[in-house]
């Protein structure tokens, strides 16, 4: 069996890895040899099981376990702290119940509990702070994980210049082209409802020493998320996204707003903060419900629309695509990811 994969980013290489393990001949087609525009290379690398839909939780748990137990990629298990405001009570309560029912060790801390454990946080406007207790959540280096897939996958990679290619010799064609999946799909008369959503991440230094054991903090009240990195922090913000892929110029003008949110939530940490750099990257955003699109039409398969979860779910998605292509039962129920699904909104995209 021969499979062509269009898109050699994190999803494409995970799919190649899982197929090659099953004895499939794979050719990967990639337009960006240095992966300079690839979304995985511009990710903050976060991994969490705290999601709002069942299959997303299951895929996260599988993927975290895969990376920790099957690769030599270093994983920083500082945790993933999600902060909910007082008007987000129902979402917090429902998601905590769902996550625990799926085996996640999520605990919902009161503001006093949050303050006792993380004394650098302002908790005045919080309802709860949620974190898992088993040390499973955290982050890894995205480029290192991608390299691990490539180093452990014996397949041919062809670097192309955007021209249309003849895939008639392939038994299956897989589209894993991120935010470009829609335009790739059109070459095969397939409409894949995904669009590019550009986000900016800032490098920030502070006058005080970095809090090395800080978890990745996702402030769902302000939309800011951050984690320690080297001698500073990397900070993202869901309020500075734009729907285009014209360029990768950061949204420098949003820094003042980001700093205000940082100072509000971390008053003793970012009181003397300095923005030292920034970069931008694309989410491949599903226009259906912010959940992934994993489906096939005859011998064309596609996985995209992860809206920031591609790196995080890459082991599970690669496994799923390999099972679909080889006509095996899928480990995960992907009905929620099919094109004809009933939308089930994944909330708080960060």
Question: Language-model segments: what does each one mean?
Answer:
Residues 73-82, 95-96, 102, 106-111, ...:
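Helix-loop-beta segment of a Rossmann-like dinucleotide-binding subdomain
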Residues 154-167:
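A conserved short coil-to-beta-strand element within the FAD-binding core of flavoproteins
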Residues 2-27:
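N-terminal Rossmann-like FAD-binding beta1-loop-alpha1 element of flavoenzymes
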Residues 20-40:
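Glycine-rich FAD pyrophosphate-binding loop
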Residues 264-350:
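C-terminal catalytic lobe of FAD-dependent flavoproteins
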Residues 206-299:
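Active-site lid/adjacent beta-loop-alpha segment flanking the redox-cofactor pocket in flavoenzymes
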Residues 36, 170-215:
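Central helical "cap/lid" subdomain
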Residues 44-117, 223-225, 262:
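Dinucleotide-binding Rossmann-like beta1-alpha1 core, especially the glycine-rich loop
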């Amino acid at each position: 069996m021969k499979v062509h994969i269009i898109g050699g980013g994190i999803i494409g290489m995970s799919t190649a890895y899982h197929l090659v393990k099953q004895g499939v001949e794979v050719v990967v087609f990639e337009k960006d040899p240095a992966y300079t525009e690839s979304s995985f290379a511009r990710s903050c690398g976060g991994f969490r099981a705290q999601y709002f839909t069942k299959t997303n939780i299951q895929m996260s748990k599988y993927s975290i376990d895969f990376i920790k137990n099957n690769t030599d990629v270093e994983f920083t298990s500082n945790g993933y702290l999600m902060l909910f405001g007082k008007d987000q009570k129902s979402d917090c309560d429902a998601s905590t119940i769902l996550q625990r029912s799926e085996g996640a060790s999520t605990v919902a801390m009161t503001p006093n509990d949050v303050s006792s454990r993380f004394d650098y946080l302002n908790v005045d406007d919080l309802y709860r702070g949620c974190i898992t207790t088993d040390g499973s959540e955290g982050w890894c280096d995205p480029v290192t994980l991608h390299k691990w897939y490539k180093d452990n996958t014996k397949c041919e990679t062809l670097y192309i210049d955007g021209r249309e290619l003849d895939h008639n010799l392939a038994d299956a064609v897989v589209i894993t082209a991120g935010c470009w999946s829609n335009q790739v799909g059109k070459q095969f008369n397939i409409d894949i409802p995904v669009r590019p959503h550009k986000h900016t991440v800032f490098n920030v230094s502070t006058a005080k020493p970095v809090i090395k054991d800080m978890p990745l903090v996702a402030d769902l009240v302000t939309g800011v998320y951050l984690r320690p990195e080297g001698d500073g922090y990397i900070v993202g913000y869901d309020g500075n996204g734009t729907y285009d892929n014209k360029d990768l110029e950061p949204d420098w003008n949003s820094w003042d707003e980001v700093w205000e949110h940082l100072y509000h939530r971390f008053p003793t940490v970012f009181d003397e903060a300095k923005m030292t750099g920034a970069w931008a990257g694309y989410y491949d955003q599903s226009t259906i419900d912010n959940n992934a699109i994993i489906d096939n039409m005859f011998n064309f398969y596609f996985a995209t629309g992860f809206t920031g979860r591609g790196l995080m779910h890459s082991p599970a998605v690669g496994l799923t695509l390999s099972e679909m292509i080889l006509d095996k039962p899928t480990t995960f129920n992907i009905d929620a990811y099919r094109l004809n699904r009933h939308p089930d909104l994944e909330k708080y995209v960060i």
